[in-house]
A protein has these predicted regions:
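Axial heme c-ligation environment in periplasmic c-type cytochrome domains
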Residues: 38-45, 65-98, 103-105
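Electrostatic cytochrome c docking/interface patches
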Residues: 1-21
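Gly/Gly-Pro-rich "capping" loops immediately C-terminal to redox-active cysteine motifs
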Residues: 15, 19, 31-64, 79-82
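The canonical Cys-X-X-Cys-His
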Residues: 18, 22-32, 77, 91-95
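Short acidic/polar alpha-helix capping motifs at helix-coil junctions
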Residues: 5-10, 24-26, 39-42
Length: 105
């Protein structure tokens, strides 16, 4: 873990769906609960990813197209196959609830 976080006692229904999808599709790189992994991928529970800097559409584009490294030195993120926009929206809901619970916004 690259950051220490607190997890909420409960999530909205959409965020619960997002949590399951995140653990299946994102956690291998970004770590369980989006805390990042040294040498692999950054934490998403970080001020860099707050909604005014990386809006929801930025997450949609990153999943669909991949993204060139620009804030961290982890290398480029590849596109993630097998997720619909609606599923990514649920993942975003999960990440945003974690961010909010940890004072990111």
């Amino acid at each position: 873990a690259l950051v220490e976080i607190k997890t909420p006692k409960s999530y909205s229904e959409n965020a619960r769906i997002g949590l399951r999808l995140f653990e299946a599709k994102c956690a291998d790189c970004h770590g369980s609960n989006a805390v990042g992994q040294a040498g692999v991928a950054p934490p998403l529970i970080h001020i860099i990813y707050e909604p005014n800097h990386h809006g929801d559409e930025s997450f949609q584009r990153a999943v669909a197209l991949g993204v060139r490294a620009h804030h961290w030195k982890f290398g480029n993120m590849p596109a993630v196959a097998g997720l619909t926009r609606a599923e990514v929206k649920s993942i975003i809901a999960y990440v945003r609830e974690l961010q909010r619970h940890n004072g990111i916004f």
